């Protein structure tokens, strides 16, 4: 079973948690896109949901495949969000944002009664941090914000490159018009302390640490899909 097949397995398992009539947050990324394709098949057969996308990319795919969408302002409270992750640990702490949609992903997840993460087994880690931590920042005062991030990291014993994400000939721009700094900290033993420190920096719009948000993870491997709960 290759990586895409595992993503499809996880998405299929997640679809079993979606009930007709739900207000559904729909995530961003390659695994979430497999979920959208499967969801579209159910919608075509008469399944009723109202979706709220976490990115313009997801919105385009949903519209292309016929998945009905609303804005979060129209549906400010959601029943369930299904989204992928770049890393997930045994306590269901996540690193997200590899696709650049971390701010909207976190807003949508926080508006949901429940968040289910779908991923293949390569995303499961003992300690977060092998994947670069995305940090969404305001364009104004970029250097000041980067220095502040470095100071927060240093206080926690974290070092590593903090690079500006690029796209083509310029910087990557989020759907909200912000920049992303990707921090290569390596192991992050105290994710809560790092999150608190980043939250206190004025130029940081949001970061990719999703802590205490997921209630279940569906992890697919060669033998099929399994579920993880916070341990």
Curated annotation (Swiss-Prot):
Quaternary context: Homodimer.
Associated pathway: Carbohydrate degradation; pentose phosphate pathway; D-ribose 5-phosphate from D-ribulose 5-phosphate (non-oxidative stage): step 1/1
Reaction catalysis annotation: aldehydo-D-ribose 5-phosphate = D-ribulose 5-phosphate
Keyword Acetylation among UniProt keywords: no
Active site residues of this protein: 105 (proton acceptor)
One Pfam family here: Rib_5-P_isom_A
Key words, A-Z: Isomerase
Family: Belongs to the ribose 5-phosphate isomerase family.
Protein name per Swiss-Prot or TrEMBL: Ribose-5-phosphate isomerase A
Organism field: Sinorhizobium fredii (strain NBRC 101917 / NGR234)
Biological process, per Gene Ontology: pentose-phosphate shunt, non-oxidative branch
HAMAP family: Rib_5P_isom_A
GO molecular function list: ribose-5-phosphate isomerase activity
UniProt EC number: 5.3.1.6
Function of the molecule: Catalyzes the reversible conversion of ribose-5-phosphate to ribulose 5-phosphate.
Residues at which substrate binds: 28-31, 83-86, 96-99, 123
């Amino acid at each position: 079973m290759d990586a895409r097949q595992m993503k499809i397995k996880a998405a299929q398992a997640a679809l079993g948690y979606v009930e007709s009539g739900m207000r559904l947050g729909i995530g961003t990324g390659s695994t979430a896109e497999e979920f959208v394709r499967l969801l579209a098949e159910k919608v075509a057969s008469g399944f009723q949901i109202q979706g709220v996308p976490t990115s313009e990319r997801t919105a385009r795919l949903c519209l292309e495949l016929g998945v009905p969408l609303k804005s979060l302002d129209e549906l400010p409270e959601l029943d369930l969000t299904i989204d992928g992750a770049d890393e997930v640990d045994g306590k269901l702490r996540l690193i997200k944002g590899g696709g650049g949609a971390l701010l909207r992903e976190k807003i949508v997840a926080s508006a949901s009664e429940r968040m289910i993460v779908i991923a293949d087994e390569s995303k499961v880690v003992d300690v977060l941090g092998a994947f670069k931590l995305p940090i969404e920042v305001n364009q104004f005062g970029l250097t000041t914000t980067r220095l502040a991030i470095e100071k927060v990291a240093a206080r926690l014993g974290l070092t590593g490159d903090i690079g500006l994400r690029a796209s083509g000939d310029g910087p990557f721009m989020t759907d909200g018009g912000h920049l992303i700094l990707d921090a290569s900290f390596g192991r992050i033993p105290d994710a809560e302390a790092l999150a608190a420190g980043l939250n206190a920096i004025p130029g940081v719009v949001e970061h990719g640490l999703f802590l205490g948000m997921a209630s279940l993870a569906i992890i697919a491997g060669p033998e099929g899909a399994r579920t993880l709960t916070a341990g």
